[in-house]
């Protein structure tokens, strides 16, 4: 195995650490800022407040990377689509159903994303130079599912029925979102992000044929476009829940880093790390348990991934009820772990 130059730098031989949703509700300092803003989208566009909460986990835990505080649904919102977040419910969107809806999307974009790029610039200015800054977007497929369902966390029968019955319109919508995603990610890089992540939260709901069309192909297009402008920018992909199709994804998508969910065996991570940097994959629920369990699980991952191309992370976002002291303990376990 050839060790790949780590996209997130450290001066020692310990794996870099950052956590998905590391700026979030488990932190009291985050909640204090959140209470000052009326709604979640307003929070995402508030340059000072979004910068502050992006930096909070860096100041508290010393993570090796910051990820911009934002949301994957700022993209459809910036296309003029109706998006709202309801407390204890989650995202609610106007449901995409027709060619008329597609025409509306094409004609009603706004400049809301400029605030996101201002946030990236401000964070980069205030972040330690040694700390990486991750910009991100949702994958075209995952963003599509929210628009087709009108909300999150469904069984996705509406989305799947739509792409089976409306192949041409589904392809048009996918391509449109793909192009807008490319522009959004490139603008984040221009603003100071030095790593990009593509979150495909609902990749795992598709059969193989549709997985190739709606997950693999648009992701390849995004990466090719970004690399055309910024060949040295590392790109993290996350086809969450893809199971056996992770391997097909890795065969076809020229990703720099593959984020792994908790259901993928560690031995698979170890094998894949011979060709690509892997990131993951501690079950977020582990951080709700005790220090003995946390330490055992972390040490198991570290022992298997020793001397591999590896970034430590969770297999999904940190849970709101996570005790911050358990996150502190996680960082301590990784930093103090002695490799054999």
From Swiss-Prot:
- What does it do? Catalyzes the decarboxylation of four acetate groups of uroporphyrinogen-III to yield coproporphyrinogen-III.
- Give a GO biological-process term: protoporphyrinogen IX biosynthetic process
Q: Does the keyword Membrane apply?
A: no
Localization of this protein: Cytoplasm
The UniProt gene name for this protein comes to hemE
Q: Which reaction does it catalyse?
A: uroporphyrinogen III + 4 H(+) = coproporphyrinogen III + 4 CO2
An example of a Gene Ontology cellular component annotation for this protein is: cytosol
Transmembrane region(s): none
* Annotated metabolic or biological route of this protein: Porphyrin-containing compound metabolism; protoporphyrin-IX biosynthesis; coproporphyrinogen-III from 5-aminolevulinate: step 4/4
> Mind telling me which InterPro entries this protein's record contains?
UROD/MetE-like_sf, Uroporphyrinogen_deCO2ase_HemE, Uroporphyrinogen_deCOase
Molecular function terms, GO-annotated: uroporphyrinogen decarboxylase activity
Q: Which family does it belong to?
A: Belongs to the uroporphyrinogen decarboxylase family.
Which Pfam families does the record associate with it?
URO-D (PF01208)
Chain positions recorded as substrate binding sites: 21-25, 40, 71, 146, 201, 316
Coiled-coil blocks:
none
Record-marked site positions (Transition state stabilizer):
71
Protein name according to UniProt? Uroporphyrinogen decarboxylase
User: Which Enzyme Commission number(s) are on file for it?
Assistant: 4.1.1.37
Q: What is the protein's major site of localization? A: cytoplasm
UniProt entry keywords in alphabetical sequence: Cytoplasm, Decarboxylase, Lyase, Porphyrin biosynthesis
Statement: the UniProt record of this protein carries the keyword Lyase: yes
Subunit: Homodimer.
């Amino acid at each position: 195995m050839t060790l790949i130059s780590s996209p997130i730098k450290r001066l020692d031989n310990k794996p870099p650490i950052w956590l998905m949703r590391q700026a979030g509700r488990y932190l009291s300092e985050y909640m204090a800022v959140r209470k000052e803003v009326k709604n979640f989208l307003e929070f995402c566009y508030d340059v000072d407040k979004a910068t502050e909460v992006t930096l909070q986990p860096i100041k508290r835990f010393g993570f090796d990377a910051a990820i911009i505080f934002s949301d994957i649904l700022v993209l459809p919102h910036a296309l003029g689509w109706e998006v709202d977040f309801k407390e204890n419910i989650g995202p609610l969107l106007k449901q995409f159903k027709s060619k008329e809806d597609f025409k509306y999307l094409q004609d009603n974009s706004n400049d809301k994303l400029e605030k996101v790029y201002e946030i990236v610039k401000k964070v980069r200015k205030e972040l330690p130079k040694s700390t990486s800054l991750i910009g991100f977007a949702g994958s075209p497929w995952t963003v599509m599912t929210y628009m087709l369902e009108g909300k999150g966390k469904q069984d996705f029968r509406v989305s799947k029925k739509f792409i089976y019955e409306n192949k041409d319109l589904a392809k048009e919508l996918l391509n449109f979102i793909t192009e807008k995603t490319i522009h959004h990610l490139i603008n984040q890089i221009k603003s100071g992000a030095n790593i990009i992540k593509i979150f495909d939260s609902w990749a795992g709901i598709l059969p193989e044929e549709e997985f190739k069309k709606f997950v693999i192909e648009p992701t390849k297009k995004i990466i090719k476009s970004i690399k055309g402008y910024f060949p040295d920018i590392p790109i993290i992909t996350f086809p969450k829940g893809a199971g056996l199709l992770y391997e097909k994804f890795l065969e076809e998508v020229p990703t720099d880093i593959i984020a792994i969910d908790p259901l993928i065996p560690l031995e698979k991570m170890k094998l894949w790390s011979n060709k690509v940097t892997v990131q993951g994959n501690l079950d977020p629920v582990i951080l709700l348990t005790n220090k003995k369990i946390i330490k055992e699980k972390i040490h198991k991952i570290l022992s298997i991934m020793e001397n591999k191309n590896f970034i430590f992370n969770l297999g999904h976002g940190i849970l709101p009820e996570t005790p911050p002291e358990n996150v502190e303990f996680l960082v301590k376990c990784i930093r103090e772990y002695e490799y054999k």
